[in-house]
């Protein structure tokens, strides 16, 4: 066990795979800026390490969800461009200016209030990306009239820079014409005013499924980490992505249950014969939810069923006789075609692979593998 963490479970993160996925999108869109999305702690895998690795391999512009996430990147030496995709409370707009962070303008009314917060003595620029709602029904303005009014406000302020405009696809990972309709609406609105430096509409699914000459940037989130946005996308593209995360643990205790004996809370599992069980130091506080009961983990190449209720910190599995304390357990595999893939876990949890990754708790150490070195990051002991 490493002296940088003191429990028998961790997440392997393959930084080489993440770089390879980034380069896949660079080849798919050779004349566009590929914007890695490192929000939610880099989809659970570590935004700082991911951003540094990608900067070393040519990334120039990152996207996050919140101003706090952007400032965290700045505090750790990430000096590339950063766009906050979410709405910043207007009273904190000067923090964005201070940290050289581009912000999203969702409406004219928001911008009017934000400008009031900028002191007349300010001499630094604020980069702005205007958000258009073309069908997601979430953030953004819906009309060309409001869009043009916002641009007029931006151009009327000496330190506001109209750097970008973007939208977000609602159904790019599903069959149908929704994405094309949204793209058409986006182009119609954007075409009614001067174009900024960055025009972007494609998320991971959009970037895999569609090319558009109208845009000059793509935002890549889930697929940066090696995961397809949906089974539909995976089956309809000829692009190979490399999953980058593997969740490892080990058996910390074994014991025999006799017929009639039960395990875990509620005693919902009762042995009907003599049964060997193993305990894994992983639970729902780590991102392995209670609904994983009945699923399996991989122990020495054998599929072992999760029995009883998953606890906060521990999980119990049924094991064959040869399994012993210290044997390696694969909770989530870094191969897409195995029973422990992120997609298989998502199916069991009735969710999507995005959420499986984002659920990975900060108390799980991350072990980063790259062509240069191996580095351990423990958020609890940093």
Swiss-Prot record:
Has keyword Isomerase? Answer: yes
InterPro entries with a match to the protein in the record: Ala_racemase (IPR000821), Ala_racemase/Decarboxylase_C (IPR009006), Ala_racemase_C (IPR011079), Ala_racemase_N (IPR001608), Ala_racemase_pyridoxalP-BS (IPR020622), PLP-binding_barrel (IPR029066)
Q: Where does substrate bind?
A: 138, 312
What GO cellular component is one of the record's annotations?
cytosol
- Kindly give the Pfam families that the UniProt entry links to this protein: Ala_racemase_C, Ala_racemase_N
Pathways per UniProt: Amino-acid biosynthesis; D-alanine biosynthesis; D-alanine from L-alanine: step 1/1
| Record key words, sorted | Isomerase, Pyridoxal phosphate
Quote the CDD domains the UniProt record gives.
PLPDE_III_AR (cd00430)
Name the chemical reaction catalysed here. L-alanine = D-alanine
E.C. no: 5.1.1.1
Give the matching SUPFAM superfamilies.
Alanine racemase C-terminal domain-like, PLP-binding barrel
Picking any one GO biological process from the record gives: peptidoglycan biosynthetic process
Tell me the superkingdom of the source: Bacteria
Q: Name one GO molecular function term.
A: pyridoxal phosphate binding
> Active site annotated at which positions?
39 (proton acceptor), 265 (proton acceptor)
Which PANTHER family does its entry note? ALANINE RACEMASE (PTHR30511), ALANINE RACEMASE, CATABOLIC-RELATED (PTHR30511:SF0)
Sequence similarity: Belongs to the alanine racemase family.
Protein's job: Catalyzes the interconversion of L-alanine and D-alanine. May also act on other amino acids.
What protein is this chain from? Alanine racemase
Q: Which organism is it from?
A: Staphylococcus saprophyticus subsp. saprophyticus (strain ATCC 15305 / DSM 20229 / NCIMB 8711 / NCTC 7292 / S-41)
